[in-house]
């Protein structure tokens, strides 16, 4: 099993698709890496030679920030926005959409399930 950047790549998938299992590498970057290393994108992970695996591993680790490093950088960026009191930081802190979306309706993904408030109770007749 090929292990690149601490991620076990699925053996039955094409290398091009398997590389996208690494956080920080999408389809475009996967194609770039394969072109740079000269590995055929249609090769299955189980058919990769040891030299191809090491070439891919080296190319990814030297060129891109992936997995834990990238996750921590993103987290630090958000923390910095919150610390300096930027508007985007406030939105993160309150758990609301950050990029200007409407919140009167929608935004349920970011806000979570509705917190229902009891309506007015009907007066009882005497």
From Swiss-Prot:
In terms of InterPro entries, this protein maps to: Rbsml_uS13_C (IPR027437), Ribosomal_uS13 (IPR001892), Ribosomal_uS13-like_H2TH (IPR010979), Ribosomal_uS13_bac-type (IPR019980), Ribosomal_uS13_CS (IPR018269)
The protein's name: Small ribosomal subunit protein uS13
Name of the gene encoding the protein in the UniProt record: rpsM
Q: Which GO terms describe its cellular component?
A: cytosol; small ribosomal subunit
Q: Tell me the keywords, alphabetical order.
A: Ribonucleoprotein, Ribosomal protein, RNA-binding, rRNA-binding, tRNA-binding
Organism encoding this protein:
Deinococcus geothermalis (strain DSM 11300 / CIP 105573 / AG-3a)
Q: Main role?
A: Located at the top of the head of the 30S subunit, it contacts several helices of the 16S rRNA. In the 70S ribosome it contacts the 23S rRNA (bridge B1a) and protein L5 of the 50S subunit (bridge B1b), connecting the 2 subunits; these bridges are implicated in subunit movement. Contacts the tRNAs in the A and P-sites.
- Its GO biological process terms? translation
Protein family according to the UniProt entry: Belongs to the universal ribosomal protein uS13 family.
